[in-house]
């Protein structure tokens, strides 16, 4: 299993300034035998979870028959109905900083137990996650090996499913409408009165509590609120990484 714990990280450029490391996505290259084992474990997990109906219906990332398009269409239908009735909609777009890399292993394993995953399968997943080593490779040059203390490996076969299970209970903390695409969360409410704005702010507060409990960090700079309609948009706030309350940046769409 040692070879399965070794990964070469290749930085894949996303967008923005190329000299900013934050603008690169780390992708893990692992051994072929490890990927084969991951595929077998993933198939077993999916078959088991399908019998339980465990994955939230609000999750559209890495799910068969669901996609960015299904996520968008479900939302647009509700928003259009609200506009036809003469109401606006406030939509919160929430971003987690280095979400896949931040997943704490012990807490993930505890969550897996709540879904009925025990015994040898759980021990294999624990072995897969813990005592991993990585080094970064760029144009044939490599860094030294370092130990990975948290996260599910991006670019791996099993990593996305483990991440979905980790965030699977997030919708349970939210009163209003929510859709997820892996680590991207979208929460909205039809605004008929000030009480609806207040309810959406309460969801933000609940999301902050979930994040604190599970050691995930909201990226306040990338969180946005979009108001659909002609009425004024309310101000919403959340805690930044320093614990200070900051107002979420607004995008207005008429």
Where are these regions (language model features)?
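Short, conserved micro-motifs composed of acidic
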Residues: 140, 202, 217-252
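Hydrophobic alpha-helical membrane-association signature
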Residues: 75, 162-166, 200-203
């Amino acid at each position: 299993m040692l070879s399965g714990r070794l990964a070469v990280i290749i930085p894949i450029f996303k967008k923005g300034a190329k000299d900013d490391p934050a603008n690169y996505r780390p992708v893990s290259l692992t051994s072929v035998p490890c990927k084969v084992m991951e595929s077998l474990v993933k198939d077993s997990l999916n078959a088991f979870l399908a019998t339980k109906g465990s994955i939230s219906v609000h999750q559209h990332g890495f799910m068969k028959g669901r996609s960015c398009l299904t996520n968008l269409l479900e939302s647009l239908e509700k928003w259009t109905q609200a506009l036809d009735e003469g109401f606006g909609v406030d939509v919160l777009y929430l971003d987690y900083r280095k979400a896949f890399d931040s997943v704490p292993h012990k807490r993930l394993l505890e969550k897996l137990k709540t879904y009925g995953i025990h015994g040898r399968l759980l021990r294999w997943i624990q072995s897969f996650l813990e005592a991993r080593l990585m080094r970064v490779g760029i144009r044939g040059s490599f860094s030294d090996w370092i130990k990975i203390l948290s996260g599910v490996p991006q670019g791996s076969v099993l990593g996305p499913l483990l991440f979905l299970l980790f965030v699977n209970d997030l919708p349970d903390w939210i009163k209003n409408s929510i859709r997820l695409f892996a680590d991207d969360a979208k929460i909205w409410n039809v605004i008929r009165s000030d009480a609806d704005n207040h309810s959406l702010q309460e969801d933000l507060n609940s999301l902050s509590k979930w994040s604190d409990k599970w050691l995930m960090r909201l990226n306040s700079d990338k969180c946005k609120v979009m108001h659909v309609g002609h009425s004024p948009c309310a101000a919403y706030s959340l805690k930044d990484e320093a614990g200070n309350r900051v107002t979420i940046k607004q995008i207005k769409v008429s």
